[in-house]
Amino acid sequence: MTASSAKPASSVDSFFSATLAEADPEIAAAIKGELGRQRHEIELIASENIVSRAVLEAQGSVMTNKYAEGYPGARYYGGCEWVDVAENLAIDRAKKLFGANFANVQPNSGSQMNQAVFLALLQPGDTFMGLDLAAGGHLTHGSPVNMSGKWFKAAHYTVRRDDHLIDMDAVAKQAEEVKPKLIIAGGSAYSRPWDFKRFREIADHVGAYLLVDMAHFAGLVAGGAHASPVPHAHIVTTTTHKSLRGPRGGLILWNDEQFTKKLNSAIFPGLQGGPLMHVIAAKAVAFAEALRPEFKTYAKNIVENAKALAESLRAQGFDIVSGGTDNHLMLVDLRPKGLKGNVSEKALVRAGITCNKNGIPFDPEKPFVTSGLRLGTPAATTRGFGVAEFQQVGSLIAEVLNAIAQAPDGSAPLVEAAVKAKVKALTDRFPIYQ
C-alpha cells in the first residue's frame, strides 16, 4: 500500500475506538430503548430469559471476526487455535452438564438443530411422529408450513380432550399403525411431565429413533428440576437460551457413537458453513454458569414460581390448561372470560407485562387470534422474583384481563396505566444490568 492510498491514522483509530453511540446513534438508541423495556417490564414469554453480563461480553467479543469451518482440530482455515479452545470448552461443559457422551455446539438455532437430525436420520418422504402444534408441539415437529412437514410425512399425536394430557397408550397405538422412522417428544406449550422411558419403549417396539427436543425445559434438566431425557433418547436437542439462560442457539446431544459422523456432517457441511464462534464462546460461558450449585436453586425456583403464578390465576377464576404446571410455563384458557389471546396480549403489554397469545388444545380460533395466553417464569425468576412476587403478578394479570373483559373495545386505559405503575415499582426492586 502506498502512502497516498493508505487511510489516515485517525480514520483507522476511529474505526477501532468509536463507541456504538458515536458510530451509529440510531442503532444505539434502539438498543437503549430495548434495555429500558427489559428493565421496566415483567417478561413472561416462556421462551425468553435474561443472560448474564458475562454471556453478553463473550457474544460481543473478537470471536465474531473468526471463520472456523469444520470442527476443533479439523478446520478449513488457519488461525483457529483459540476458537478451538472455546469450542472444546463448550463441548466438554455441555457433556458434563447433561451427562451425555457427545455434543455438537454449532447449531445456529433450534430449527437448524432439528433439521440436522432429520438430515442425519431420515429421507424425504419418511414418516415421523411429533406432538401436534395445536396441542403444544412446535413448528419443526411437522407443521405443514415448516420444512419438517413439507419434506417428510408427519403423523401427529395429541392430548386428551378431558385433561389435556398426552395419552401414551394412544401414542403407542398410533406408532403401531404408522410405523414411524422417528418419534419426537417435546414441545413449546406442554406444561406436564414427559414419559421419556415409555416413549423409548414405544420407539424400540416399532423400530424408530427417539428424538427429545428439550428446548423449553433444558435449564430445568440441567438444574435437576426436571427428569433428563439423555438416558432414554437416541438424540436430544435443545436451544441454549430459554430456561438454560444462554445465548440464542442450538445444541445436539447423544450417547451412541454411531450417530457422531451423521450428526456432525449434517450440521457441517450439510446445513451450515462457518460456525458462529462468538455465540459458541457465549454458550460455553452459559454452560459453566449452569454447572454451578446456584443454578440448581434457580431451576427449582422457576418451577415453584410457575406453580405459584398458575395457582394465583386459578384462585382468581382463570382456567389453566391441564389444571396447572410442572415446569416453567402454563397456558391460560381465556374462553370462560370471553376474551381472545391477541386482545389480551396487547392489553397486558400496554400494562408492562410481556407475554404471548397462544393456541390451546382444540382451539377454534386462528393462530393470530387464539383462545389462550402462554406465560413463563424463567426471565422474571432470573431477576429475583419469588413466590410472593409471582402471586402479585397473577393479581396484576387478573386486574387487566377482568377489566378488558368488561370493555367493548378490549382496552381499559385507566386500569392498564395503574397496573403499569405497579409493574414499574416491582421491577425497580429487581434491577438488571446496573
UniProtKB/Swiss-Prot annotation:
Its EC number is 2.1.2.1. It is found in: Cytoplasm. The record marks 241 as: Plays an important role in substrate specificity. GO terms for molecular function: glycine hydroxymethyltransferase activity; pyridoxal phosphate binding. GO terms for cellular component: cytosol. Keywords: Amino-acid biosynthesis, Cytoplasm, One-carbon metabolism, Pyridoxal phosphate, Transferase. (6S)-5,6,7,8-tetrahydrofolate binds at residues 133, 137-139. It comes from the Bacteria. It is an enzyme of class 2 (transferase). It catalyses: (6R)-5,10-methylene-5,6,7,8-tetrahydrofolate + glycine + H2O = (6S)-5,6,7,8-tetrahydrofolate + L-serine. InterPro entries: PyrdxlP-dep_Trfase, PyrdxlP-dep_Trfase_major, PyrdxlP-dep_Trfase_small, Ser_HO-MeTrfase, Ser_HO-MeTrfase-like, Ser_HO-MeTrfase_PLP_BS, SHMT-like_dom. SUPFAM superfamilies: PLP-dependent transferases. Its cofactor is pyridoxal 5'-phosphate. Catalyzes the reversible interconversion of serine and glycine with tetrahydrofolate (THF) serving as the one-carbon carrier. This reaction serves as the major source of one-carbon groups required for the biosynthesis of purines, thymidylate, methionine, and other important biomolecules. Also exhibits THF-independent aldolase activity toward beta-hydroxyamino acids, producing glycine and aldehydes, via a retro-aldol mechanism. HAMAP family: SHMT (MF_00051). Homodimer. This is Serine hydroxymethyltransferase.
